[in-house]
Amino acid sequence: MKEKTIIIVGGGQAAAMAAASLRQQGFTGELHLFSDEQHLPYERPPLSKSMLLEDSPQLQSVLPAHWWQENNVHLHSGVTIKTLGRDTRELVLANGESWHWDQLFIATGAAARPLPLLDALGERCFTLRHAGDAARLREVLQPERSVVIVGAGTIGLELAASATQRGCKVTVIELAATVMGRNAPPPVQHYLLQRHQQAGVRILLNNAIEHVVDGENVELTLQSGETLRADVVIYGIGISANDQLAREANLDTANGIVIDEACRTCDPAIFAGGDVAITRLDNGALHRCESWENANNQAQIAASAMLGLPLPRLPPPWFWSDQYSDNLQFIGDMHGDDWLCRGNPETQKAIWFNLQNGVLIGAVTLNQGREIRPIRKWIQSGKTFDAKLLTDEDIALKSL
């Protein structure tokens, strides 16, 4: 019997790791990856950090260049897909070529959620999703330039740190009452707000742009009535899933391709993962996790499901953020207001713990990354703790 053909659509973390996972799990059939980017699939996290700060930055490939040939994966870079061919099982390219598939994995990622008021500025307005975006930003983030960043989420704050380190004068505008409101607990939000302010970043909370004038500088009038002048304007206010091909194929979508716990779409032969995917939970709610690790996890899950193998057990959600000299790592459940702190954040070394009835369900480390491994095990096992012992620095964590 002829082995099936699997096609991967996308050129990022989830796409590359799906190819790797399929081969690692024993798939020997024909395997293709189609991407609209010219580069080999590359790591996205460095775009807001090392790609802006290093003297001679280089893209970091997810997999070495030789891996693709050695593992007989056919790379099709810089191509545009016209249709997925859900009914015909024939992927069609803009140049007219068609490629048969038996199973499909979609990992087309996401674009920056548009902000029309700023998009009207054209090339004077920036977002950050791809290598080309980072290259353009690197050129304009020059010392003494005035930079306005709209959005104080993870990307916004990382960009604020990088721009400040490049000598720019940075102002951040945030509609909410805090920074990193979606994915950091209150004490970490407080720490990051102070950290950026101490670095010279002006952060304007509970505010938004009402009017923009494009002249020698960009003039931005805020809801508060204040007018800012900027040489560079950047925004990051969320994502818009690149799900157009899926919508045209009549797959279920909701600002993302709706998948189940096996990364399967409403079509049993089509799977999706990474930022383009949104998971329907058992209670019917939709949930998206935008992180490097989630892209890896969903790639592995989809590969297992496509091959009819048991699904891997998911670890607690984890992501990291580098801002200035700080490395913050977030693991587990970030919800809840009753967080404990081990150490002193003012020394830039601390761990915040989230206990629920004595059970550790989440944590954030500040320049204590080596502690993530035991913390991950404790969260997975549902380990209980005495709060006093957990926050006592005289007691080594590994002894608890």
Curated annotation (Swiss-Prot):
InterPro entries: FAD-oxidoreductase/Apoptosis (IPR050446), FAD/NAD-bd_sf (IPR036188), FAD/NAD-binding_dom (IPR023753), FAD/NAD-linked_Rdtase_dimer_sf (IPR016156), HcaD (IPR023744), Reductase_C (IPR028202), Ring-hydroxylating_dioxygenase (IPR053382)
Cofactor(s) this protein cannot do without: FAD
Single GO MF annotation: 3-phenylpropionate dioxygenase activity
Binding-site positions, FAD: 5-36
One matching Pfam family: Pyr_redox_2
Positions contributing to NAD(+) binding: 146-174
Keywords tagged on the record: Aromatic hydrocarbons catabolism, FAD, Flavoprotein, NAD, Oxidoreductase
One CC-aspect GO term: cytoplasm
Keyword presence, Oxidoreductase: yes
Function: Part of the multicomponent 3-phenylpropionate dioxygenase, that converts 3-phenylpropionic acid (PP) and cinnamic acid (CI) into 3-phenylpropionate-dihydrodiol (PP-dihydrodiol) and cinnamic acid-dihydrodiol (CI-dihydrodiol), respectively.
HAMAP family: HcaD (MF_01651)
Protein name per its UniProtKB record: 3-phenylpropionate/cinnamic acid dioxygenase ferredoxin--NAD(+) reductase component
